[in-house]
């Protein structure tokens, strides 16, 4: 190993920067160090700004949480959905049969048949529909047709 101030062999000077004489050091080393310092300062300021923003958000969240929950309670969720929420009744009624087919319980046979066809095409078991739902659709059609006079 070379002593301080003595020029090292060419191979070692490329590997170990401490063996280089001060005049042989890279001229842009100070620029790189300044960039590093600037980057660290920018990162530090960014973290500080993020911390202050988070602190502000947490402070303002408590009052906003109450306002949001009150507003959510005022909005009625059933009005957003056009679908019937709930399962099937134990014994099917005319009202439920009408809901399944999408017709009035007092609809005529022609309207019931067209509605049955439309709903069955969408829910047929051969096309990936549920056999249980298909059975309920058929049951609704049978119930409405047997109780309808025209």
UniProtKB/Swiss-Prot annotation:
Where in or outside the cell? Mitochondrion inner membrane
Please describe the quaternary structure of this protein: Interacts with the TIM23 complex. Directly interacts with PAM16/MAGMAS; this interaction counteracts DNAJC15-dependent stimulation of HSPA9 ATPase activity. Associates with complex I of the mitochondrial electron transfer chain; this interaction may interfere with the formation of supercomplexes that facilitate the transfer of electrons between complexes.
Q: Which UniProt keywords apply?
A: Chaperone, Membrane, Mitochondrion, Mitochondrion inner membrane, Phosphoprotein, Protein transport, Translocation, Transmembrane, Transmembrane helix, Transport
Which gene name belongs to this protein?
DNAJC15
Q: Which cysteines are joined by disulfide bonds?
A: none
Question: Which residue ranges are assigned to the Mitochondrial intermembrane compartment in the record's topology?
Answer: 1-35
Q: Which SUPFAM superfamilies match?
A: Chaperone J-domain
According to the UniProt record, list the residues that bear Phosphoserine.
104
Example of a GO cellular component annotation carried by this entry: TIM23 mitochondrial import inner membrane translocase complex
Membrane topology is: Single-pass membrane protein
Query: Which terms under GO biological process does the entry name?
Result: cellular response to starvation; intracellular protein transport; mitochondrial electron transport, NADH to ubiquinone; negative regulation of mitochondrial electron transport, NADH to ubiquinone; negative regulation of protein-containing complex assembly; protein import into mitochondrial matrix; protein-containing complex assembly; regulation of lipid metabolic process
Q: In which tissues is it expressed?
A: Expressed at highest levels in heart, followed by liver and kidney.
Instruction: Tell me the lineage of the source organism.
Output: Eukaryota, Metazoa, Chordata, Craniata, Vertebrata
* UniProt name for this protein: DnaJ homolog subfamily C member 15
User: What are the transmembrane regions?
Assistant: 36-58
Q: Name one GO molecular function term.
A: ATPase activator activity
Instruction: Quote the function comment for this protein.
Output: Negative regulator of the mitochondrial respiratory chain. Prevents mitochondrial hyperpolarization state and restricts mitochondrial generation of ATP. Acts as an import component of the TIM23 translocase complex. Stimulates the ATPase activity of HSPA9.
User: In terms of domain of life, where is this protein from?
Assistant: Eukaryota
Keyword Transmembrane helix present in the record's keywords: the answer is yes
Q: Which PANTHER family match?
A: DNAJ HOMOLOG SUBFAMILY C MEMBER 15 (PTHR12763:SF7), PTHR12763
This protein's record includes keyword Transcription: no
Q: Which residues lie on this side of the membrane: Mitochondrial matrix?
A: 59-150
- Write down the disease named in this UniProt entry: Absent or down-regulated in many advanced cases of ovarian adenocarcinoma, due to hypermethylation and allelic loss. Loss of expression correlates with increased resistance to antineoplastic drugs, such as cisplatin.
Species whose genome carries this gene: Homo sapiens (Human)
Which residue range or ranges hold the J domain?
96-150
């Amino acid at each position: 190993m070379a002593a301080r101030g003595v020029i090292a062999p060419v191979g070692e000077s490329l590997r170990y920067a401490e063996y280089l004489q001060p005049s042989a050091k890279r001229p842009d080393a100070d620029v790189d160090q300044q960039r590093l310092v600037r980057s660290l300062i920018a990162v530090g300021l960014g973290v500080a700004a993020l911390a202050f923003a988070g602190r502000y958000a947490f402070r303002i969240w408590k009052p906003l949480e109450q306002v949001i929950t009150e507003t959510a309670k005022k909005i009625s969720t059933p009005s957003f959905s056009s679908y019937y929420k709930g399962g099937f009744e134990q014994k099917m009624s005319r009202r439920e049969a009408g809901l399944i087919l999408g017709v009035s319980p007092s609809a005529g046979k022609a309207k019931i048949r067209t509605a049955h066809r439309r709903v069955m095409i969408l829910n047929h078991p051969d096309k990936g529909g549920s056999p249980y739902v298909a059975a309920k659709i058929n049951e609704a059609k049978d119930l409405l047709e047997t109780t309808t006079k025209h």
